[in-house]
A protein has these predicted regions:
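Intrinsic disorder/low-complexity segments
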Residues: 1-57, 61
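Edge beta-strands of extracellular beta-sandwich domains
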Residues: 157-164, 281
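Acidic, Ser/Thr/Pro-rich low-complexity intrinsically disordered segments
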Residues: 64-116, 130, 153, 168, ...
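Long, low-complexity ectodomains and other extracytoplasmic segments of secretory-pathway proteins
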Residues: 162-172
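Strand-loop-strand motifs at the edges of beta-sheets in extracellular beta-sandwich domains
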Residues: 114-118, 122-136
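Ligand-binding face of N-terminal immunoglobulin V-set domains in extracellular IgSF glycoproteins
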Residues: 82-86, 128-156
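Internal, charge-rich low-complexity segments
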Residues: 7-8, 15, 108-120
Length: 288
């Protein structure tokens, strides 16, 4: 980028000097020049556009040679316990290492190779290669976001961020949970790690609440690389809809509600387009 800017500056300076000597430009205020004729302006623009095109082509070619991480399963990991993680992206079958966080921790590469692309999805969006990793985060690792960087012989990817939680903050979804009678009981403050496994599938969770409680129920999916477009609905104990929501933050869903009465409530999570599969993963959290 610096070299490109320097070349462009030198070119423009040279054209200005030539134009000034030939009388094709008139000196304006504050050292600016205005052309007498449009010929040199056209020539200047043509050269500048050529330089810009060459620079962009070179940058694109370089970007095509370095790896890129587009998603991870699971979407969140815990500290202090062994982690198995699958990354998807471009050129991950060529990685030599995965850097974890800003320290010296590196993941063990268990396997790497090509990955099947789901029908009707762009390979650049979902990734056509994958890598399976193993590592353990120190227990003192703070909650929040953690960067992962894929490295090949050609260079390193831009950092990909994954959500980190303290031990026991994550709850794994348990099947079957596709109806009120089989709803999975969850607690406030915990994060459920779930998957919409098949088309036209609904995951149902039961929550105990008190009258007057103000709750925030959120689903995180697309903003952390999932293919899922979540639709979130809250039902009361009688199975009546309290509130439903599709998109809030991008294509993810959040709803805020004050409970009218005490008792059981049911939260349903599904894809807004009735899609499903191993890449339709999500995080569900209820806070007050």
């Amino acid at each position: 980028m610096r070299k490109f800017r320097r070349q462009l500056t030198e070119l423009l300076s040279g054209l200005r000097r030539v134009s000034e000597k030939s009388g094709d430009c008139v000196l304006m205020g504050q050292g600016a020049y205005a052309p007498r004729s449009g010929r040199r302006v056209v020539a200047c623009l043509a050269v500048c556009l050529s330089l810009t095109a060459n620079f962009c082509t070179a940058q694109d070619a370089k970007a095509d040679k370095v790896p890129k991480i587009v998603g991870a399963i699971p979407l969140a990991i815990e500290t202090g316990v062994p982690i198995k993680l699958t990354l998807r992206g471009q050129l991950l079958d060529q990685i030599t290492e995965i850097k974890v966080g800003s320290g010296d921790l590196k993941a063990e590469i268990v396997s790497k190779g090509k990955a099947a692309v789901p029908p009707n999805y762009d390979a650049k969006r979902v990734g056509e290669t994958q890598a399976e990793l193993k590592f353990t985060l120190p227990a003192e690792t703070p909650s929040g976001r953690l960067s992962l960087i894929a490295v090949t012989a050609e260079g390193a990817s831009v950092p990909y961020e994954i959500i980190v939680a303290k031990a026991d903050e994550l709850i794994q979804e348990k099947e079957p949970n596709d109806g009120f009678k089989t709803a999975q009981l969850i607690s406030m403050g915990k994060t459920v790690v779930g998957t919409i496994h098949d088309q036209r599938t609904v995951d149902v969770f039961e929550l105990k609440g008190e009258a007057g409680q103000k709750l925030t129920i959120s689903v995180v999916a697309q903003q952390v690389g999932s293919l899922m477009d979540p639709f979130l609905t809250l039902y009361d104990g009688a199975g009546q809809v309290v509130v439903g929501v599709d998109d809030n933050d991008g294509r993810d869903a959040t709803l805020e509600v004050t409970l009218a009465k005490s008792g059981s409530y049911y939260i349903t999570v599904q894809d807004a387009n009735d899609a499903g599969g191993p890449h339709f993963v999500y995080l569900l959290k209820v806070t007050q």
